[in-house]
Amino acid sequence: MKILIAPLNWGLGHASRCIPIIRHYLAQRDEVVLAGDGDSLLLLRKTFPELRAIDLPSLELCYTSNSQQKGFYIRAIWKLIRSTIADHHYLEKVLAIESFDLIISDNRFGCCSRNVRSVYITHQLYPILPKRLQIFQPFARALHAFIYKRYAEVWVPDYADTSHNLSGSLSHGGRFDHRAKYIGPLSRFVTLHSTLHGATLHNTPYTT
């Protein structure tokens, strides 16, 4: 099985929690190709120097002292939308010349395809905004839902138990459909089990 793994470049958390997934598939003798940009992709390249990597369009978005201002949030949403479109278009160009059996995107909104089974990793099924930005929260949740519903599955790196979990209402704040698979916390310091609560990390590969 040939797998493309693409984490968001927003801090190193998205890339670092992809490390145990990459190790799992390599142990299964699958072919893994990395994709991303910036420090996030650099971390994966340093961790897996033997793997090929594809550079994706960069998302230039960072927190500032004005990050809780409405103007910043509106601009950030616009940048995210543009980045998602650019990511998706670039990915489709890659897929036109190279085939994959599975795409795993850690919060990289545009890394999915109708022609390849795609998985989205997030612990924020229900985004929570600062108080002064609460007016935008319904829109933020609707936008995020629109994005992850384009994927075949959503992997939530947390426990399914509503009384025993790490991300609280971010991942347990409402109803969700069959796409959600709570796979347990991911850490680069821990080796994955052969199965993760019914998710795809097992010996039976996805079929396209």
Feature locations, PLM:
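Extreme N-terminal starter segment of soluble prokaryotic enzymes
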Residues: 1-3
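A short, glycine/small-residue-rich beta-strand->loop->alpha-helix junction that serves as a flexible
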Residues: 7-19
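Conserved nucleotide-sugar phosphate-binding/catalytic loop shared by glycosyltransferases and other
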Residues: 7-9, 28, 32-78
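Conserved nucleotide-sugar donor-binding subdomain of glycosyltransferases
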Residues: 68-110
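Short, well-ordered beta-strand core segments
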Residues: 103, 118, 154-155
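Active-site proximal beta-strand in glycosyltransferases
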Residues: 114-130
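A nucleotide-sugar donor-handling region in carbohydrate enzymes
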Residues: 130-196, 205-208
